[in-house]
Amino acid sequence: MSNPITITESAQSHFAKLLAQQPEGTNIRVFVVNPGTQNAECGVSYCPPEAVEATDTEYPFSGFSAYVDELSLPFLEEAVIDFVTDKMGSQLTLKAPNAKMRKVSDDASLMERVEYALQTQVNPQLAGHGGHVRLISISDDGVALVQFGGGCNGCSMVDVTLKEGIEKELLAQFAGELTAVRDSTEHDRGEHSYY
C-alpha cells in the first residue's frame, strides 16, 4: 500500500531525535481535526504503544512509524511534513492539501472537481482575508457560478480576484470544460469587508 504522507529526511531525523527522549515504543500520530470542513487542521503528536487503535494504519519511516486514524486517512492524501531551518530558526511544517476536502477521483463530475479546486487551491488564499468562495452551479455551456462569503463579500477587489485569479486558474485547469466564471454574490459593503 502506498504511503499518502511524505515525511522529508530532515523531518524524519527531527522526529527520531524527539522520539529518542520518549519511552521506548513511542511513535508519532498524524491526524486531521474537523476533516472535510473549512476548519480542518492537521497535527502531529506522540503515539505511545497503548494509544494505537486496531483501525489505525501504520506507515514505517526511518527509525519510527507514523500512525493515522481511519477518519483522517483520506484527508492526508498528498500531505508533506518537512523540517525547515532558516534565519529565523527551525520549524516543522505540515502541508495537507486535502484536509478540508477529500481528494476527488479523475472521473468525478465537473461540479465535484471544480468544487475541490476551489476548496483546496482558491480558498486557502482567500482565508488570509477572512474570505471564501463556493461553487453554486455550472451551466450547460460551461459557465461556473460562484458565491463569495466572509471578508470577500463587499470587498472592492473581488472583481480583480475573480477575473485575474480564480477565473484564470480554473479556465486553465478545466480547459475545454469551463468557459467562464461568474460571481453570484450581492456585494453590499459592510463591516465585514476586507477592503
From Swiss-Prot:
Quaternary structure and interacting proteins, as annotated: Homodimer.
HAMAP family to which the protein is assigned, alphabetical: Fe_S_biogen_NfuA
Job description of the protein: Involved in iron-sulfur cluster biogenesis. Binds a 4Fe-4S cluster, can transfer this cluster to apoproteins, and thereby intervenes in the maturation of Fe/S proteins. Could also act as a scaffold/chaperone for damaged Fe/S proteins.
Keyword match Transferase: no
Cofactor, free-text remark: Binds 1 [4Fe-4S] cluster per subunit. The cluster is presumably bound at the interface of two monomers.
UniProt-listed InterPro entries: Fe/S_biogenesis_protein_NfuA (IPR017726), FeS_biogenesis (IPR000361), FSCA_dom_sf (IPR034904), HesB-like_dom_sf (IPR035903), NIF_FeS_clus_asmbl_NifU_C (IPR001075)
Cofactor: [4Fe-4S] cluster
Gene Ontology biological-process entries: iron-sulfur cluster assembly; protein maturation
Keywords, alphabetical: 4Fe-4S, Iron, Iron-sulfur, Metal-binding
GO molecular function annotation: 4 iron, 4 sulfur cluster binding; iron ion binding
Annotated positions binding [4Fe-4S] cluster: 152, 155
Superkingdom as given in the UniProt entry: Bacteria
Protein name, UniProt field: Fe/S biogenesis protein NfuA
Protein family (similarity comment): Belongs to the NfuA family.
